[in-house]
């Protein structure tokens, strides 16, 4: 009997290895086919930006992946500077703020933006203006994310409270858009700091329904597994949605498998998930939705062009994909309308298909999944493709 048991285990291992090799071979074949088609399409139909985006502008849209600091428009930055001229002079002496020409330029903007957002009033202006701009772009549901910071003027608790108050005020000032907050836990954070912030979120949940989720963000080259237990706690004890920045760069795939097995509600970017047989298998098996930011990926050079985006790869396989902006303030041509336009012409999406993507996005929003509020009216607008 023992020999039979060993024999069966060996057979099972061989079968598992064979299945793994088979999946790897199929992925490679699919990838080559996709790349061939993308190359052919690029040669005969390069991406051309049209001035007329009326159809996409007038479409009610859902945004699930937008960072507050990266969404500040030049107009918003100007308003923040004008609110504190002394501070503005200090910042302008230290930094030179220019329109970025590439991703290095984008990253160069963030120290300036973080310096600007050190006071409560600056946070209030930033949130109000960003929500206002998304509403003007006919976004009907927005999850905006930010990482609490401790500054000379605010504690982590102060930062969260200012955010909550700003979102509450926006509900009344901008009733056409449903707005919620995702709190970012940065990969660089000490575990104790991230745990402290999660505790503050728990306290805030007793007073408000503004906070609907937490995310893992920060430098994609860093391993984020030391914070994994906090995301388990966030879901189990706080009832929060979980979204994880994963597989943004090939240089760090170390933490991907562990976070996929956590079965997060959504994945941010996930640019290279399909390049590894096992992570491709897990993503497909669990059908974990992907928040895809086309312009951000092209601008950061993690994808060579729009057609080489992983958007269509996963869409063909039945994995939900959502059109998002990431950092509309610092990445040129990345408003939500422009992202919908680019997705439509790149992947030949019909109006009905775009409506379907919006429906899926709202179904996977944290406010819907965790019964935070009634979204009947928002669903009506999306289903009928109307704004009123």
From Swiss-Prot:
Catalytic residues (positions)? 248 (proton donor)
Residue positions binding Zn(2+) = 65, 67, 245, 326
User: How is the cofactor bound here?
Assistant: Binds 1 zinc ion per subunit.
Which SUPFAM superfamilies is this protein grouped with? Metallo-dependent hydrolases
Looking up Gene3D superfamilies in the UniProt record yields: Metal-dependent hydrolases
- Residue ranges, compositional bias (Basic residues): 1-13
Tell me which Gene Ontology terms the entry assigns under biological process.
adenosine catabolic process; inosine biosynthetic process; nucleotide metabolic process
Residue(s) at site: Important for catalytic activity: 269
The catalytic activity of this protein is classed by the Enzyme Commission as: 3.5.4.-
Compositional bias segments (type: Basic and acidic residues): 14-34
EC primary class:
hydrolase
| Transmembrane segments annotated in the record for this chain | none
Which cofactor does the UniProt annotation name? Zn(2+)
One of its Pfam families is A_deaminase
Q: Which family does it belong to?
A: Belongs to the metallo-dependent hydrolases superfamily. Adenosine and AMP deaminases family.
Its subunit composition reads: Monomer.
* Protein name according to UniProt: Adenosine deaminase-like protein
Naturally occurring in which organism (per UniProt):
Caenorhabditis elegans
